[in-house]
Swiss-Prot record:
Protein family according to the UniProt entry: Belongs to the class-I aminoacyl-tRNA synthetase family.
Statement: the UniProt record of this protein carries the keyword Ligase: yes
Species of origin: Xanthomonas campestris pv. campestris (strain 8004)
UniProt-recorded name of the protein: Leucine--tRNA ligase
GO molecular function, one term: ATP binding
Motif ('HIGH' region) on chain: 46-56
Subcellular location: Cytoplasm
Broadest EC class assigned to this enzyme: ligase
Length: 879
């Protein structure tokens, strides 16, 4: 008998050996020529920021576990990887490091690829691409020119955040307290020409398609439904008059609550609305207000939270029923880019209008009441106190103060008003969507050039396909003020492809969501001359997509939309890009800080802190290792640079090995829940890996034997039963439930049972061999390096374990010779008995009545009946 010390497990040596074998055999390179069922498993591609974080590790490990499991269950599995390489962070890094964004990006890709490989992911690297290369973005340029010709891509003015110092457009998150994040300048709202894709043409299809996505989380589908925001209402015309009473262009407003029309006391328009601009020409005070409102937010979240501000324009709108004139106000919560840039204001039944009206002393009228109020609060109506029922149309309502419409409910009023307006040509029924067309222009350098040429004679002309790609110059000096291609006349100036006259290229670049909206299809045919080829229809739709729920709306909406564009271009056959979606939770960690001199907080990395915990593992004290002095405990939060609570995956792999890091990231929490990083937990996984290593080597030292199931003892049968119960559970946890933490726990239980199984006989060793082989294969999707090595130690040779079939349950092994039954007296547990699996009812009843503890509780009682739940419980009813 040989003994192996725990430190004999050398993760670095084991992992290097396995990875060399996989590389040499091109183990995970796949093609479409297979009679196996396909399985396409995909993680959301990373941005090459320079280093992996633990969120990446968790995401890609989930995908890898599923991919390896599917290979072992006989599937032809594609798991690719690429780089979402355009975007703002590269520009910021270029400014900071005084380098070209391209150089910074490609260096990061090299580093992060090496990090991914060190974690042992079963990736087909032959399909790798970066979205910033012309070989990739030429296809989206070609698609865009085709969409232009079909009318699905168009150009119009749109409001953006403009930094007047840096002369560039800012994303909403780059505006801090109304100022540019870098220059500190007051940000303006400015209208500039932008390119759009008509996603609204697909709004209903995007909505209907959600009903077919049974493998997507309900939470994601709900968010998409709300974002698409289908609503049925009326579009109503309000005539407009200026201060002299002269007629101006009428306003058209959309409302889902025409029943509240008689409660309109003013009309709100956006600061950029043509009527506001017209009124400002003769009103300097209004012109000043419009200039001020240019510095407000443009996102919906900002509109909800910012102070309501506005000013009367001096114009009036004519109520389409009463004929009364109501004032037209500019309001900062109305956006020109949403609907018509005008809304009918019903302060009695809309909270935003209510707040605005109270601030500026505008009339507030009740025109709806509840037919069956549930309390005094719902009976009362107060123009100075908002109550949620004012806007609730889910209850039985009745119109009041509404002339001939009094007494109607919501539906009756809707139909009556719709009929009236359609008959008089003042309005019409309309289905509206909250979803807006996708603005794809970005006034940035590091992105895919938009393939359009502007000619004074011919207008906007798509670049001919034989002149694509329009290549972005990469060797540039980037200072952050403006774009290098805007100031490069040799790149910008060209000739018109239609008339041959002088022309200029578009200097905007695509929104980076463009690149990530079709990459899933490009992986299927990365060397195709067109966007994709016939191989796409073999792999698409992808079977599993893994990523964060923060992408539920924008990325996943554009992702679905672009796939439908590709379908309509006959590039793919499927309606949806992905069948199943898994949204993993965040990785969180403890935070620690000290108060800074400036009143802020200096965040300290947990690796630099000595932590004291109570018996339940809660942090009760902490001190800085460097000086031994206390630090404040900030609680657990998402790992981030701002809170300095990130953990370097590379350092963890160097310390514990990739398998241990993978094991902990799968064991610490179910995939959909947040994972709290805890190095004590990582230590626990490392101990388990060493114990498994010792178990296998100790067993091999004793020698194996052939299994003879007919001659097994009761104890040997029990271990074999435990082995096959574990196989069944892990198979279900991997394949159906994606419950990797419980799969690991089941294997650990089997390992514990084996540790107590001290049987050195031939059949004892044979049962142990079967159990250890099963454990190695069951863990292979999570700890592939160690499994690769231990499979060889068990005498099975060096092979790709993904080609070894996943263990199968032997139903005969699950049959028990004896059963343990719980004994209840009047429903309360009083003991257990062991009975033969085929014991007769009379025998079970006799043993149950004779069980000592049960007999004690039956003393003096009469047994009325005995209920037996086969294989589980005997309940004695007595009184």
């Amino acid at each position: 008998m040989s003994t192996v010390e725990p430190n004999a497990y050398d993760p670095q040596q084991v992992e290097t050996s396995a990875q060399q074998f996989w590389d040499a055999t091109r183990a995970f390179q796949v093609d479409e020529n297979s009679d196996k069922p396909k399985f396409y498993c995909l993680s959301m591609l990373p941005y090459p920021s320079g280093a992996l974080h633990m969120g990446h590790v968790r995401n890609y490990t989930i995908s890898d576990v599923v991919s390896r499991y599917k290979r072992m269950t006989g599937h032809n599995v594609l798991q690719p990887m690429g780089w979402d390489a355009f975007g703002l962070p590269a520009e910021n890094a270029a400014i900071k490091n005084k380098t070209a964004p391209a150089k910074w990006t490609y260096a990061n890709i090299e580093h992060m690829r090496a990090q991914l490989k060190s974690l042992g992911y079963a990736i087909d690297w032959s399909r790798e691409f970066a979205t910033c290369t012309p070989d990739y973005y030429v296809h989206e340029q070609r698609m865009f020119t085709r969409l232009m010709r079909k009318g699905l891509a168009y150009r119009r003015n749109a409001v953006v955040n403009w930094d007047p110092i840096d002369q560039t457009v800012l994303a909403n998150e780059q505006v801090i307290d109304g100022r540019g994040w870098r220059s500190g300048a007051l940000v303006e709202k400015r209208e500039i020409p932008q390119w759009f894709l008509r996603i609204t043409d697909y709004a209903q299809e995007l909505l209907d398609g959600l009903d077919q996505l049974d493998g997507w989380p309900d939470s994601v589908k709900t968010m998409q439904r709300n974002w698409i925001g289908r609503s049925e209402g009326l579009e109503i015309q309000f005539d407009v008059r200026d201060t002299t009473g002269a007629a101006l262009d009428p306003l058209r407003v959309f409302t889902t609550r025409p029943d509240t029309l008689m409660g309109v006391t003013f009309v709100s328009i956006a600061a950029e609305h043509p009527l506001a601009q017209h009124a400002a020409k003769s009103n300097p005070e209004l012109a000043s207000m419009l200039e001020t409102l240019k510095h407000g937010g443009v996102s919906e979240a900002e509109l909800e939270t910012q102070e309501k501000r506005g000013m009367a324009t001096g114009l009036t709108a004519v109520h389409p029923i009463s004929g009364e004139e109501v004032p037209v106000w500019v309001a900062n919560f109305v956006l020109m880019g949403y609907g018509t840039g005008a809304v009918m204001a019903v302060p009695g039944h809309d909270q935003r209008d209510f707040e605005f009206a109270n601030k500026y002393g505008l009339p507030i009228v009740q025109v709806v009441k509840l037919r069956e109020p549930r309390n005094d609060d719902e009976q009362a109506w107060d123009a100075t106190q908002w109550r949620d029922w004012y806007t609730d149309k889910s209850r039985e309502l009745e119109l009041i103060n509404s002339a001939e419409f009094d007494g109607l409910d919501y539906h009756g009023a809707f139909e009556a008003l719709a009929e009236r307006f359609e008959r008089k040509g003042q309005g019409q029924r309309r289905i509206n969507y909250r979803l807006r067309d996708w603005g794809v222009s970005r006034q940035r350098y590091w992105g895919c050039p938009i393939p359009v040429i502007y000619c004074a004679k011919c207008g906007a002309v798509p670049v001919p396909e034989d002149q694509l790609p329009v290549v972005l110059p990469e060797n540039v000096e980037f200072a952050g003020t403006g774009s290098p291609i805007k100031t490069d006349p040799t790149w910008r100036q060209t000739t018109c492809p239609e008339c041959g006259g002088p022309a200029e290229r578009e200097t905007d670049t695509f929104d980076t969501f463009m690149e990530s909206s079709w990459y899933v299809a490009r992986y299927t045919s990365p060397n195709a001359r067109d966007m994709v080829d016939r191989r796409a229809n073999y792999w698409m739709p992808a079977d599993l997509y893994v990523g964060g729920i923060e992408h539920a709306i924008l990325h996943l909406m554009y992702f679905r939309f672009y796939h439908k564009l590709m379908r309509d271009a006959r590039l793919v056959d499927s309606d949806e890009p992905v069948t199943n979606l898994l949204t993993q939770g965040m990785v969180i960690a403890e935070t620690f800080y000290r108060d800074a001199d400036n009143g802020g907080k200096d965040w300290i990395n947990p690796a630099d802190v000595e932590i004291q915990r109570d018996e339940r593992g809660r942090v009760v004290g902490a001190s800085l290792i460097a000086d031994g002095q206390p630090v404040h405990i900030g609680g657990t939060e998402k790992m981030s640079k701002s809170k300095n609570n990130g953990v370097d995956p590379q350092a963890m792999v160097a310390k514990y090995g990739a398998d241990t890091v993978r094991l902990f990231s799968m064991f610490a929490a179910p995939p959909e829940q947040s994972l709290e990083w805890n190095e004590a937990g990582v230590d626990g996984m490392a101990r388990f890996m060493r114990r498994l290593w010792v178990q296998v080597h100790k067993h091999v030292g004793e020698g194996a034997a052939a299994l003879d199931v007919a001659s097994l003892s009761a104890e040997q049968k029990a271990i074999r039963r435990k082995t096959h119960e574990t196989i069944g559970k892990v198979d279900d946890d991997y394949g159906r439930r994606h419950s990797f933490n419980t799969a690991i726990a089941a294997v650990m239980e089997l390992s514990n049972a084996l540790a107590k199984f001290d049987d050195a006989s031939a059949q004892g060793r044979a049962v142990r061999q079967e159990a250890l082989e099963a454990m190695v294969l069951l863990l292979n999707p999570i700890t592939p390096h160690a499994s690769h090595a231990l499979w060889q130690v068990l005498g099975r040779g060096e092979t790709l374990l993904e080609n070894v079939p996943f263990p199968q349950v032997d139903a005969a092994a699950l049959v028990r010779d004896a059963l343990t039954l719980a004994i209840q007296v009047n429903g309360k547990l009083r003991g257990t008995i062991e009975v033969a699996a085929d014991a007769a009812r009379e025998q079970i009843e006799a043993l149950a009545l004779a069980e000592p503890n049960a007999a004690k509780f039956l003393d003096g009682l009469s047994v009325r009946k005995i209920i037996i739940v086969p294989g589980k419980i005997v309940n004695i009813v007595a009184g």
